Amino acid sequence: TAVRKITENPRCVTDDMMKAVADKGGTIGITTFSPFIRTERQPTLDDYLDHYDYAIDLIGEDHVTFATDWFDGKTKVNWATPWYYPEVTQGKKYDGLGLIGFRTRAELPNVVEGMLKRNYSAARITKLLGGNFIRVLKEVWK
């Protein structure tokens, strides 16, 4: 998902939804699926990190998690599927998926670098890049 206050899309979460998840001790994952990050132009890594900043300010760093929608190994039909669902792509005005600066797994270090530039601590980055998700799994799978 991503933040609906930043990108108006029915698949993005509202502030109330994020608060409800946090109130139960859960975590929301910020996706790299570009139509959820920005629609008027190809989103950048900074646009992606803006969703983290907003969510962290609203519900705290313990309730936000790294998430991706990778398309490795997809066929032409799989790639075309999002365009059959305009309610999901919300009038995306650019070609391709992914973020400028973070298009593949190989560019994951760019995410960490971007977080460091925003003065995220090592402890926060650890939580965001899997620590929160693992915490929730441990709590749920007792």
Region locations from a protein language model:
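Short, electropositive alpha-helical surface patch
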Residues: 44-57, 80-93, 141-142
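Short acidic/histidine-rich active-site segments
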Residues: 31-32, 59-84, 90-101
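Conserved, mostly hydrophobic/aromatic
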Residues: 28, 55, 69, 125
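A conserved active-site cap/scaffold subdomain adjacent to cofactor or substrate pockets
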Residues: 22-45
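Active-site environment of divalent metal-dependent phosphoester hydrolases
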Residues: 3-6, 34-38, 72-74
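Mid-to-C-terminal alpha-helical segments outside catalytic/metal-binding sites
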Residues: 94-142
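Histidine/acidic residue-rich metal-binding segments in metalloenzymes
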Residues: 9-26, 46-62
